């Protein structure tokens, strides 16, 4: 293979992730790479919540079009931005090692969620974070926050918010870990499906490339991500509902923790299950939670 062209969004975090994959391909597979950057609709439409404008697929469509038109061979994504169902002909070809999956509490004035005064304004665009935060502290005011990491931090620094919630992984990767005031325990805020994992998307028809990319695959990331995504798929969850799932691998045993909540955080259901087949585990836990009223909670 002469060269691999990688499609990427233009943000600093997207380029960090893409360069991470590029460097691994070049050093471990000995194949030269180039990066092709592009803006997605998710990057352009910043004045509306994601759940109102089409969801996570808005961060991927342009990259997938580039692959279909032979302008790129693969695309690199943050797995939490990848819908549970990919368009026909696409697949997830390689999972990178997971960074810290927890949500991060970021504030210039307060040390933790517990330190926030009544009525404090917290910024997040995630229904999952909003619901869990309100369940823990129903006296807070949650306001939407869109944009890349730098934009969100500048809005905090300008005084628009008392605190904001971001993914720890992105801040760590951009060497902004000093901005994290508190790593939020998963007992308070269960992470998004796939949070902290960088993934490579490719075309199913490209067997030669898939075989090469598979050599970069992190087995642990792949197994825990498969469990989390199977849970999400069984529930048919997207960014328009408050769903969280986080799996840990110990030897061959996977512990999957999951949460569904109403958007106001007043109703919440959490469950845990252990198994060794990630797809089966995710489906079984989702079915158990559906039997316990998960859909009614998500609709409320």
Curated annotation (Swiss-Prot):
SUPFAM superfamilies, alphabetized: Periplasmic binding protein-like II (SSF53850), Porphobilinogen deaminase (hydroxymethylbilane synthase), C-terminal domain (SSF54782)
GO cellular component, one term: cytoplasm
Residue numbers carrying S-(dipyrrolylmethanemethyl)cysteine: 239
Cofactors that this protein relies on: dipyrromethane
Cofactor note: Binds 1 dipyrromethane group covalently.
GO MF: hydroxymethylbilane synthase activity
One Pfam family in the UniProt entry: Porphobil_deamC
GO biological process, one term: protoporphyrinogen IX biosynthetic process
PANTHER family attached to this UniProt entry: PORPHOBILINOGEN DEAMINASE
Similarity annotation: Belongs to the HMBS family.
Other notes: The porphobilinogen subunits are added to the dipyrromethane group.
Protein name: Porphobilinogen deaminase
Gene that encodes it: hemC
């Amino acid at each position: 293979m002469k060269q691999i062209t990688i499609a990427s969004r233009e943000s600093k975090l997207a380029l960090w992730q893409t360069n991470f994959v590029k460097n691994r391909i070049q050093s471990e597979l000995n194949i030269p790479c180039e990066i092709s950057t592009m803006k997605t609709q998710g990057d352009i439409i910043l004045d509306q919540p994601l759940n109102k404008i089409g969801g996570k697929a808005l961060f991927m469509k342009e990259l997938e079009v580039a692959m279909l038109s032979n302008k790129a061979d693969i695309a690199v994504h943050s797995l939490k931005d990848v819908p549970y169902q990919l368009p026909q002909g696409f697949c997830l070809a390689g999972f990178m090692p997971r960074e810290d999956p927890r949500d991060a509490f970021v504030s210039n004035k307060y040390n933790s969620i517990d330190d926030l005064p009544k009525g404090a304004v917290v910024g997040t665009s995630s229904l999952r974070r909003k619901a869990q935060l309100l369940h823990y502290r129903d006296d807070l005011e949650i306001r939407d926050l869109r944009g890349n990491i730098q934009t969100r931090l500048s809005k905090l620094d300008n005084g628009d918010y008392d605190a904001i919630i971001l993914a720890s992984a992105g801040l760590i990767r951009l060497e902004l870990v000093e901005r994290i005031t508190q790593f939020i325990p998963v007992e308070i805020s269960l992470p998004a499906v796939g949070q902290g994992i960088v993934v490579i998307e490719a075309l199913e028809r490209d067997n030669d490339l898939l075989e090469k990319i598979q050599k970069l695959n992190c087995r642990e990331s792949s197994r825990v991500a498969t469990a989390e995504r199977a849970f999400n798929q069984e529930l048919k969850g997207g960014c328009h509902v408050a769903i969280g799932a986080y799996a840990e691998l110990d030897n061959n045993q996977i512990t999957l923790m999951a949460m569904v909540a109403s958007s106001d955080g007043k109703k919440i259901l959490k469950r845990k299950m252990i198994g060794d087949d990630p797809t089966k585990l995710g489906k079984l836990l989702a079915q158990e939670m559906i039997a316990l009223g998960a859909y009614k909670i998500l609709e409320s």
